[in-house]
């Protein structure tokens, strides 16, 4: 049974404040504060350490390990599939290029066989209707052009005007030349109207038609009469295979005293006395600039 003093002392004890108790409680709070981070960091460190190696051996750690394993397995399978696709694509491209090359070689072989063989008019008509033969027609035209080009350049090349020194040389030039060679001889004398123009034209045409043999000779060298010299010059004689196929006297009557290479060329082409020339190899007389002769001061436009 409590006395009045106990009650008074007890109430005092309940409301009594001790500094030592406060210090003890502060120490406990600090200890708990220091221990909290250590305990909170433990689960994070227990999840994964290194590359996919779980430190936590509990159920959650086993599940995470399994998920990581399946993820790596899926990535590896996808990489293998991509590598397989790249390999298949590479092999298909190489096979396709090889097949294309064989097909192109076979096509060229077939075209060559067609070109080498003889074509009838019926076959030519059928090829015009067939789109696949368009390439063959182009190839055929190209080969024909090459053949014509070779025929054009076959035989000797002259490219200049030759001076005949004597009457005997005049006869040898006609008789001893190849039968396929076309020979044009300008008979001239200095001071005759049209002679200088003819000399300049011959120089230009000799460069344009290298397979044609252009020559000139004085009328006095071949023993022509004075009457022929006065009335027939300038004269142009054309021979082939030893035969006279063209004889034009007093050319100034047709071309005038002042004419150009293009005029003489057109005049000879009108009579069919000039061969076909390759337009791509030599510049046309119509587009030539200026022709100079060592023996003449005449300028040809």
From Swiss-Prot:
It comes from the Eukaryota. InterPro entries: Phosducin, Phosducin-like_reg, Phosducin_N_dom_sf, Phosducin_thioredoxin-like_dom, Thioredoxin-like_sf. Keywords: Acetylation, Cell projection, Chaperone, Cilium biogenesis/degradation, Phosphoprotein, Sensory transduction, Vision. The keyword Acetylation applies. Residues 36-299 form the Phosducin domain. GO terms for biological process: cell projection organization; heterotrimeric G-protein complex assembly; negative regulation of protein refolding; positive regulation of smoothened signaling pathway; protein folding; regulation of G protein-coupled receptor signaling pathway; visual perception. Residues 158-301 are annotated as: Thioredoxin fold. Interacts with the CCT chaperonin complex. Forms a complex with the beta and gamma subunits of the GTP-binding protein, transducin. This is Phosducin-like protein. It comes from Rattus norvegicus (Rat). The gene is Pdcl.
